A protein has these predicted regions:
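Short, glycine/charge-rich flexible loops or terminal/linker lids adjacent to PRPP-binding catalytic cores
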Residues: 86-125
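Short, hydrophobic/aromatic-rich beta-strand segments within well-structured domains
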Residues: 66, 77-78, 89
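Short, well-ordered coil loops that connect the C-terminus of an alpha-helix to the N-terminus
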Residues: 61, 85-86
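Active-site-facing substrate-recognition patch
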Residues: 1-61
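Short Gly/Thr/Asp-enriched flexible loops that form oxyanion-binding sites at enzyme active sites
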Residues: 75-84
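Gly/Ser/Thr-rich loops at beta-strand to alpha-helix junctions
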Residues: 69-75
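A generic local structural motif
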Residues: 52-54, 75-76, 116-122
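Short glycine-rich phosphate-binding loop at a beta-alpha junction
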Residues: 62-69
Length: 125
């Protein structure tokens, strides 16, 4: 990960090249000393397809792909499609009624700046 020192008062976007595509990412405050470039893939079909293609070249042998709800959904969906896989697992942010005996685990998210629980259906664990 590259560390870039910025003046957030005057620097509102960070240009980044991802999978050969240039994008302007908004600079977002996490706390008083940490700012991140907010990468949101929703709605950017070209970026989703190209990013998935590059990630598929690097993904190790696996049983199933998994992502956390919600920003990873389009990416893992496209990766599964490109890899010819018919299934992937989604870790939900809250237990759902259809989840019989959900399994929960805590993760640290930098975009929400706090710990959060994720939930899997027991049969997916």
């Amino acid at each position: 990960m590259k560390t870039v020192y910025i003046d957030p008062e005057n620097y509102h976007y960070h240009e980044m090249t991802v999978a050969g595509l240039k994008r302007q990412l908004p600079v977002c405050r996490v706390n008083d000393s940490l700012y991140i470039a907010g990468f949101v893939i929703f709605g950017d079909v070209e970026l989703t397809v190209r990013s998935a293609c590059e990630l598929c070249k690097m993904v190790p042998e696996h049983d199933v792909l998994i992502t956390a709800e919600a920003k990873g959904i389009p990416l893992v969906h496209e990766m599964a499609r490109q890899l010819g896989e018919n299934r992937y697992i989604l870790a939900r942010k809250a237990p759902k009624l259809y989840m019989k005996e959900p399994i929960s685990f805590e993760v640290q998210s930098i975009t929400t700046a706090k710990r959060q629980a994720l939930y899997l259906v027991k049969s997916d664990a």
